[in-house]
Regions:
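A recurrent flexible, glycine/aromatic-enriched loop bordering the glycosyltransferase active site
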Residues: 161-170, 178-200
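Glycine-rich, basic loop-to-helix element that forms the pyrophosphate-binding segment
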Residues: 66-86
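A short, conserved alpha-helix in the catalytic core of glycosyltransferases
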Residues: 185, 191-210, 214-241
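Short, well-formed alpha-helical segments that are part of the catalytic scaffolds
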Residues: 13-27
Length: 275
């Protein structure tokens, strides 16, 4: 087994995964990487396209296909179950990430390999939005407090209320940032990592950590945070490790409804299980 395992999930559009793979291939120490692509709700066409991509890559690769929609975190869980890793003798680092991530830092894996996997159980790197340029990490510095829970109880009343709150918050953030310079986040321990790119050490799993996929989407950040907390594991924000995230440029009505109901479902589960 190579030193670093990368798991990503493809859904329908294989061009996004192709861009992801090409960016990964250009990195130093990519010979120490094994790439697993989960093809969620696989079709003969997506499977053929992805297999062709992986066959032509210099990376060590494997394709895992699923006829059902695994969603993101379910796809990661499926990959780990299929691989049935021996974490004591397997990869030191397991990266779970969206396929709309781009590696722009050539020495990313070289830097990661230098870190102590017994010290850094979960790593949140800099995730730079290609849309805004903002760093999406740290996702949450501290757990949700009483005010936060009240906010979410109002937010999830209905889609219209949620969208009004969302737009108001976005406008206030833009106003705030135009008046006050945003401080550069400092490295250190945090509560929750942003979910589009999370680095787990093998020690996360050896010491009781796991992937909770009892939700469809939007629950990976808090579930990871709470599992780490309950097992005395640490999550570190390390900004010197950086990737780019090609975020959605717009949020139309259909996508908003989709986002609202799935995120509400995830929050309901997280609140019942962890919060």
């Amino acid at each position: 087994m190579n030193n670093i395992l990368v798991i990503t999930v493809n859904y329908k559009n294989t061009i996004i995964t192709e861009n992801f793979i090409h960016s990964l291939e250009n990195l130093d120490a990519s010979d120490k990487v094994e790439l697993i692509v989960v093809d969620s709700e696989s079709t003969p066409k997506t499977k053929e396209n992805l297999q062709s991509l992986l066959n032509s890559s210099a990376l060590k690769t494997r394709l895992i296909d699923s006829v059902s929609n695994t969603f993101y975190w379910g796809g990661v869980a499926l990959a780990l179950k299929t691989l049935d890793l021996n974490y004591a003798n397997g990869p030191s680092w397991i990266i779970a990430c969206n396929n709309d991530i781009l590696f722009s830092q050539r020495e990313f894996f070289s830097k990661l390999k230098e870190l102590d996997s017994t010290k850094y159980h979960v790593i949140a790197p800099s995730i730079l939005s290609t849309k805004t340029g903002e760093n999406l990490n740290p996702y949450m510095a501290k757990p949700i407090n009483i005010i936060g829970k009240l906010y979410y109880s109002i937010f999830y009343l209905n889609p219209s209320t949620a969208r009004l709150i969302y737009n108001t918050r976005k406008m206030s953030q833009k106003l705030f940032y135009s008046v006050f310079k945003k401080s550069i986040p400092k490295p250190g321990k945090i509560y929750a990592p942003q979910g589009s790119f999370i680095i787990f050490s093998n020690n996360y799993f050896l010491r009781g950590g796991y992937i909770d996929n009892n939700f469809k989407i939007f629950g990976e950040e808090i579930s990871t945070a709470e599992i780490a907390l309950n097992n005395n594991l640490e999550i570190h924000f390390l900004p010197e490790l950086a990737v780019s995230h090609v975020e959605h440029s717009s949020m139309g009505t259909n996508y908003w409804s989709y986002w609202f109901y799935f995120s509400k479902e995830a929050y309901k589960y997280l609140k019942k299980t962890y919060l």
